[in-house]
Structure formats: structure tokens, C-alpha cells
């Protein structure tokens, strides 16, 4: 029997990408396909394999542009992408919620259906999906783990995690600080945010704030896909640091004694909160 494949281009932020990875792993397990993941056609603009691997028999190890080009020579759905090379595939475009396109071709076909073609091309942004299934399967690279340990060593043994989502999803930082002051002023704080002013506000308000990532002033624009954020990543090194900071902020948030979130519409916040609670109850094994 000829092996079938699903080529997936996960969209959205790191939490959304992990959610799509779990969604497509489940599909490939059910449909007996091999999952080929590519994160070079979205804001990440780098190979996910430089940051982590996924411990799953259906996830292809060692994905390359050449592999995808060769797969696209087979029987492909949607058929308009058959014969394309990886280089010819443009950046994925978000048309509307649940509708992504590549080269003007819809690539968010429903995954509750079966497809006869040998290769499916798929892109999606799985906002607010649960990552509790996929996260234990992630094995972070030594480079990520070394930097995580370095940053963790600079934090006190016990700290409170704070995540302020305040670009595309707005937060009332004044209200957040007012409502949580009785907690925030008593313990060391690790603060992660997509908004530079929010981090600076916490540092002005409290003298116990730790923050490591380089967050530029984007004027309230989306940290993932805005034109300004893309202009700030002109080299491979800048992209690698940008992506690593997002992952490392997430990992450090999960290790706090508690986690306070300013915006419950943020999937990044909610996933970090669920993992923090799971770690505090020893329900999952440490990633480090």
C-alpha cells in the first residue's frame, strides 16, 4: 500500500501552531497518513525542527523543502498545488477565520473527511484549542533547554508568572494591576508580554519584576504578522531569537507558583495556565 501524507503549514502564534500540530497528528493517526510539518510559510519563518521535535510515529523526521517538492509531484489535494515546488508556495494568507490560502488556493479543508489523494496540503490556525495532548510529546532542543535553564537560574526559586496579552487582544493593564495588587506586590514576578509598554509599566509599579525577552515597541500591532514585526527580523539570527523568546517565555510561565493572566481570550495565556496547574499537581513530567 502506498504511503499517504499530509503537508501542514500551522498558522498563528506558537500556541496556535502546537494546537494545529495536535489536530493534524490526530487526523494522520486516524487516516493512516504521515504528517509533514512546515513552519517557514508563516510568521515563524524558520524550521520548527531547530527548536523541538515531536515524539510521534506519524510525524515525519527531517522535513526539508526538497521533500515537500517531491511530495507535490504526487496526486495532491487541492489539485491546483500539484507540481508546485516548495519555493513556489507563497506565505500562507489568512482570508477569514477558518479559511487559509496558499497561492490563492483554499487549503483549510475539513479534517473530519477522508481524501483519496496521496498528499493533502493543509493550513489552519487552531485558536483556543487544547495543547495538553501535544505538549508532553515535544522534546525541546538542547539550545532551547540550555537557554531555559540559564534564564530559570536568574529567577528566584519561587515566583509568580504574569502574562499580559496587549496587542491584537487588548488588556486593561490598570485594572489588572489594581485587581491583583495584593498578590503582585508580595512576590517576585516573571512578566511576559507582547507589549513593551505593559512590561515597563509593571517594572515601574513593582520592584520585583523579571523579564528576559526582547520585545520591541510595535505600537499595539500584532506581534506575529504585522508588517513592523516582520521588518525587525531581517536575518536568520534575528528570527531565531524572536521565535526562541516566544517559546522560552511560555516555558517560564508554566513554572511559576501561580500564573496571573490579563486576557482570557489569549490561547497562549490559557495554555500556559493549564500547564502550570498540571505541573503544580505533578500531573505531567517536566520538559527539562
Where are the predicted features?
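Short active-site oxyanion
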Residues: 184-189, 257-259
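Secretory-pathway glycan-assembly enzymes, especially type II membrane glycosyltransferases
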Residues: 2-186
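Short, well-ordered alpha-helical microsegments
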Residues: 17, 21, 197-200, 268-269
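A donor-sugar binding/catalytic signature common to diverse glycosyltransferases
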Residues: 12, 22, 244-288
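Short, aromatic/basic amphipathic alpha-helical patches
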Residues: 48-57, 199-208, 271-274
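Active-site rim elements
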Residues: 8-12, 238-239, 243
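Short acidic, S/G/P-rich loop/turn micro-motifs used as interaction or catalytic elements
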Residues: 167-171, 197, 267
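Catalytic donor nucleotide-activated moiety binding site of glycosyltransferases and closely related
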Residues: 164, 186-238
Amino acid at each position: 500500500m502506498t504511503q499517504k501524507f499530509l503537508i501542514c503549514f500551522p498558522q498563528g502564534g506558537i500556541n496556535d501552531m502546537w494546537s494545529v500540530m495536535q489536530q493534524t497528528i490526530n487526523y494522520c493517526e486516524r487516516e493512516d497518513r504521515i504528517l509533514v510539518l512546515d513552519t517557514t510559510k508563516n510568521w515563524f519563518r524558520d524550521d520548527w525542527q531547530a527548536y523541538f521535535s515531536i515524539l510521534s510515529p506519524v510525524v515525519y523526521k527531517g522535513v526539508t523543502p526538497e521533500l515537500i517538492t517531491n511530495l507535490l509531484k504526487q496526486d495532491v489535494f487541492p489539485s491546483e498545488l500539484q507540481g508546485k515546488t516548495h519555493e513556489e508556495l507563497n506565505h500562507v494568507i489568512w482570508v477569514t477565520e477558518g479559511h487559509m490560502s496558499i497561492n490563492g488556493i483554499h487549503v483549510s479543508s475539513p479534517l473530519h473527511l477522508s481524501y483519496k489523494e496521496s498528499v493533502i496540503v493543509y493550513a489552519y490556525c487552531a485558536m483556543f484549542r487544547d495543547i495538553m495532548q501535544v505538549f508532553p510529546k515535544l522534546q525541546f532542543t538542547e539550545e532551547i533547554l540550555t537557554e531555559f535553564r540559564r534564564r530559570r537560574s536568574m529567577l528566584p526559586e519561587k515566583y509568580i508568572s504574569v502574562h499580559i496579552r496587549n496587542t491584537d487582544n487588548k488588556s486593561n493593564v490598570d485594572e489588572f494591576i489594581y485587581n491583583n495588587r495584593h498578590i503582585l506586590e508580595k512576590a517576585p514576578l516573571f512578566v511576559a508580554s507582547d507589549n513593551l509598554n505593559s512590561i515597563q509599566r509593571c517594572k515601574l509599579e513593582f520592584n520585583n519584576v523579571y523579564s528576559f525577552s526582547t520585545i520591541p515597541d510595535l505600537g499595539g500591532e500584532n506581534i506575529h504578522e504585522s508588517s513592523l514585526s516582520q521588518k525587525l527580523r531581517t536575518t536568520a539570527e534575528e528570527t531565531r531569537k524572536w521565535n526562541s523568546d516566544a517559546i522560552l517565555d511560555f516555558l517560564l510561565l508554566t513554572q511559576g507558583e501561580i500564573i496571573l493572566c490579563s486576557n482570557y481570550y489569549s490561547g497562549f495565556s490559557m495554555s500556559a495556565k493549564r500547564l502550570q496547574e498540571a505541573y503544580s499537581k505533578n500531573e505531567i513530567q517536566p520538559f527539562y
